Amino acid sequence: MRNILCVTLIALLGGCTSTSVTEKYQDKRNDIINVKDKVIEFETGNVLIGSVSRLYMSNKCLLIADHKSVDKQIHIFNKNDFSYLTSIGNFGEGPEEITVMGCLAIDEAHHQLYVSDHAKQKIFSYDMDSVMVDSLYKPQVKTAMNETLFPSEYQYINDTLSIAVLIKPTSTSTFNQFLGRWNMNTGEMIPMKYTHPDIQKKRIT
C-alpha cells in the first residue's frame, strides 16, 4: 500500500510541475439570450427578398444583400423608419453587373459602398449619395482581387487597413482560411500566424 501511495504522489507532483502545450480555444457557449421581444418586423413593399440574404448597417441605411436575386441584388432602406430607398447591384456578366456577389463593406467617411464579385475577382465601388438620386448610376472598379489569396469577408477601416477572412485555394474543391490584415491600395495581405484547427481544409460546395 505504501508503495502504491508513493507512486501516486510522485505522479501527482510530476503533473503539477509539467507545462501543458495543449492549445485551448472556445468551442461552445452555454449563454442563451431570448431576442424574440427585440425583433422588429417591417414591410418591404414590392421588394422581394430571397432566403439567402445578409444584412449590413451604415450610419443612415439598412442594406440587404440578396444573394439569390436575378435582378437588383442590394436593397437599401432607411435605418430609422425602414422606409424603402432604392435597389442597386444589377445581376449579370456585364461590365457594371455583379455575377457572384460576395460581402459588402462600407466606407462611412467617403460614403462609399464596396461590393465583392467573386466571379470577376473584383471589388466594385458605389457612391451612396449618387445611387439615391441616379437610377442609371454605374459603379466603378475599386480594386482587383488576387486569385491565389483573396478576402471572402472583411471589415473596412480605411484604404490601407481592413481586417479580413482570407481564402487560399489548395485545389479545385478545398482551401485554407486565415484571419489577416489587408491593404486595399497595394493588395498586400498579411495572415495571422495562428490558425484555428477547425477551419483547415474546408470544402467548397
Where are the predicted features?
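Beta-strand-rich domains and repeat architectures in extracellular enzymes and scaffolds
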Residues: I40-Q73
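Asp-box/WD-like beta-propeller blade repeats and closely related beta-sheet repeat scaffolds
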Residues: K120, M128-T160, A164-T170
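Short beta-strand elements that form the blades of beta-propeller/WD-repeat-like
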Residues: M57-H67, H111-D117, F124, D159-S173, ...
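A short helix->beta-strand "capping" segment at the edge of beta-propeller domains
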Residues: K24-G50
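Structural signature of eukaryotic scaffold interfaces centered on beta-propeller domains
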Residues: S51-Y56, C103-A109, F150-L161, T205
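Structural motif
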Residues: V70-H75, Q121-D127, S171-G180
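C-terminal motif of bacterial Sec signal peptides marking the signal peptidase cleavage site
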Residues: G14-G15
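Blade-loop segments of beta-propeller domains
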Residues: S83-H118, Q140-T148
